[in-house]
Every structure is written in C-alpha cells, then in structure tokens.
C-alpha cells in the first residue's frame, strides 16, 4: 500500500442491527433475496436512491442534472457482511463550492439509506466522520474509519450521528450557500441529541449519554412519506421494524435499543412541530 496517497474526504459507516438474528432465523434463499434487495437499493446506480437524492437536491436549489449524477457516481459504497461504508473524497485543491455539493449529496444519501433500511426492517446505527484516510479497493486505513467504527458501535439505538469535526465543516460550507432552501434543509437534517451509549446496565435511566449531532430521519419534506404515520403507536411501530424478517426481540439489550429509538423519534417529531417542518 506504499503507493497509495492519503485522501481527504467523508466516511459514513453503518451497522445493521440484529443482522445475525436475521441470518439465523431465515432460510438461506430468503436471506439472500432480502440482502440482494438492500444491495440494489444502496448502490449509487440504483434508480431508487439516485432519484430520491436527485429529487431532494433539485428541490433545494437549481442544480444541473448532469452535475448531480456525476457527484452520485463519485460517491462509493462498500458492503462487508453487516457493515455498509459510504465514501466521498475531495480533490487536493477542491473548491469550496464543490465540497459543499459533495457534503450535501453525502448527507442526503445517508438520510435516504437510513430511512429505507429502517422501513425495510433492517435498522442501522451509524456515524459520519471526515479527515484523511487511505483506501484502495476493499482496504481502508486512517483515523476517520476507526472513529466512525467505534462511534457507530457505541450507540445503543438505531441512529446516525455526526462527529463535531464533520458537522462544523459541513455547516460552514452549507450555511455559506446563497440558497436559503439549502440552509433550511441542512438545519432541519441535523439536530443535537443526548445519544444513549452502550453500557452493562439494563436500566435506561442510568445509561451513559453523550450530546451528539444526529441525522434527523423524520424530515418530512426530504421524502414523500414519513417513517412514522400520524396517530400511530410509536413504540409498537419501532418494535415492529426491529422484529421484521423473523428477528427475535426479547433480550433486554435489544428492547433497550427499541425504547431508545422510540425516544429519539419522539424528540424528532417534537422538533418538526416546533420548527414547523411537518
């Protein structure tokens, strides 16, 4: 790997919660079929994710279709068992305007991925980082990938968090945009939330928590349908997503993740109402 030069960019790392249970409780053919659908969806050549990202991006500002599709092609996806890695790199002399476009596309793609996977009964926990790293084919090295891995695995719920460094860089670029719709979208996409972290306690009141920037999966205008329909039992809705594909949801650790995810969604719903983005 001596000929590989470090690259600056963005990394998103996502783990599928309950993946082992999913494999254990389904036939090989069923598991392969479901995973194949996931792979097709997160591929940047897939019509679903491309069209959704393009629709959101075009709605936020007057983007050229050719430029948007070029940015989508430049973003890379890698899948290792229960882990999905999303990568976007910057050129050495990348212009701020180009960086801004890549950040916005990246965040929207992450939103689409997380929402699709939750709706498909394969909730994710993930983290978005930025910095210098090495990657070639399927080999990764560098602080951002380690940071994303450790942060994602520390989450005790289904959520996608963003490091302070990643948030500050994206916020500086995007909030300097001349497009008010872009700034409004960005400031609705990310909120600060007390994220519950893994510990050995079964008592949710005693869990370690950390205030982290968190992707808002309930931004209604980002997709035509919200994850949570109005007047639904929120806990039951989240529980059903965790139970899909014959997954067992009986262990205290899993039920705690369900409860923590429900609390996050309650916060996101309140945020939407307060900020009139419903």
Residue ranges of model-derived segments:
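Catalytic NTP-binding/metal-coordinating core of nucleotidyl cyclase/transferase enzymes
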Residues: 2-112, 119
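Short, solvent-exposed loop/turn segments at secondary-structure junctions
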Residues: 19, 133, 167
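A short acidic (Asp/Glu
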Residues: 22-24, 89, 136-143, 171-174
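A short glycine-enriched loop-to-beta-strand structural element that forms part of the catalytic core
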Residues: 79-86, 122-134
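Catalytic strand-loop-helix junctions within cyclic-nucleotide turnover domains
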Residues: 89-99, 127-139
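Catalytic-core segments of nucleotide cyclases and related cyclic-nucleotide turnover enzymes
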Residues: 99-104, 114, 135-152
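Catalytic/regulatory signature loops of cyclic-dinucleotide turnover enzymes
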Residues: 115-126, 130, 145-166
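Intrinsically disordered, glycine/charged-rich C-terminal tails and inter-domain linkers
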Residues: 157-160, 164-278
